[in-house]
Amino acid sequence: MEPRVITYTKNVFLPLTSVCRNRCGYCSFRTPVQEGCVMLPEEVEAVLAQGQAAGCTEALFTFGEHPEEEEGFRAYLEKTGYDTILDYCEAMCRLALRYGILPHTNAGILTYDEMKRLRPTNASMGLMLETTARIPAHQGSKGKEPEVRLAMMEDAGRLKIPFTTGLLLGIGETAAGREDSLIAIRDIHKKYGHIQEIILQNFCPKNNTPMAAFRVPDTQEICNTILMARRILPEEISIQVAPNLIDASRLIGCGVSDLGGISPVTIDYVNPEHPWPAFNDLKKIVGDATLQERLCIYPRFIRPGWYDPGLQPLINRLNQRISRGSSQP
């Protein structure tokens, strides 16, 4: 019997802005329009330089959804020298490529044309489905309408973009709702074959949010959801948990196959109170399994060419580099 392989990526986290049109009850990432709400180009470049020196292969670009809808945001965006957040994101993705790091953008709801525009500079993209249920946590958050998120996932499939999605567990959904969400992901993947992985992320309450006192799902509940996902989803879709948010060592046996992006350079800006595990601790987390670094584009998508031809030299070079290296970080 072959040993199990647990994968991870080495990344830098680049939150281009914390301004967002949504008002999710569990989120502390979103901030008002204020000084420092936009990451400036020189700040992005400094992080990319550190990431290059640390051997990072992924630049995770995130920003609040449709920040231009928030009054006063454009005045701060102008300081970057770009007219729209999409212009800025595209330019910073190109900058990441010049540093030899593959971009992965997760920016909330994007249209078909917006994703098509970003595709040449992104090895993969993502959007958390979170849930197909309508829940109080998403009141005032039009970007969290399930139909809108599912439609974007379909558009990504039509564009042949390797895609990451997932569920946020413990925000008011039920076990039946989780099953419905997993089935929806499975059905979209059956049509397009583009889902690389799903993240099963446990809710972590944040101070000074409406859901600060919500119950946190326990490890057994997360394990049951992982088992459900493994039963519903095709084997080629990896199941990821975040090792800074939960004791991943207790979930490896439930069917987890990936630990996601872990950074030697940047914090988890969405969950800043939860530091990444040290790279030397990852082997302890996976136990008897084999730990293997990967790129943000999974190997099975490299061979068929699910990316812009302009990315091929860098993808091949980075893939060869991590393939030659040890499974140790």
From Swiss-Prot:
Record-linked SUPFAM superfamilies: Radical SAM enzymes
Molecular function terms, GO-annotated: 4 iron, 4 sulfur cluster binding; 7,8-didemethyl-8-hydroxy-5-deazariboflavin synthase activity; iron ion binding; transferase activity, transferring alkyl or aryl (other than methyl) groups
Residue stretches making up the Radical SAM core domain: 6-244
Catalytic activity, reaction form: 5-amino-5-(4-hydroxybenzyl)-6-(D-ribitylimino)-5,6-dihydrouracil + S-adenosyl-L-methionine = 7,8-didemethyl-8-hydroxy-5-deazariboflavin + 5'-deoxyadenosine + L-methionine + NH4(+) + H(+)
Cofactor-binding details, from the entry: Binds 1 [4Fe-4S] cluster. The cluster is coordinated with 3 cysteines and an exchangeable S-adenosyl-L-methionine.
Disulfide pairings: none
Listed SMART domains: Elp3
Metabolic or biological pathway, per its Swiss-Prot or TrEMBL entry: Cofactor biosynthesis; coenzyme F0 biosynthesis
Binding partners and assembly: Consists of two subunits, CofG and CofH.
Assigned protein family: Belongs to the radical SAM superfamily. CofG family.
HAMAP family associated with the record: FO_synth_sub1 (MF_01611)
Function: Catalyzes the radical-mediated synthesis of 7,8-didemethyl-8-hydroxy-5-deazariboflavin from 5-amino-5-(4-hydroxybenzyl)-6-(D-ribitylimino)-5,6-dihydrouracil.
Name under which the protein is recorded: 7,8-didemethyl-8-hydroxy-5-deazariboflavin synthase
Organism: Methanoregula boonei (strain DSM 21154 / JCM 14090 / 6A8)
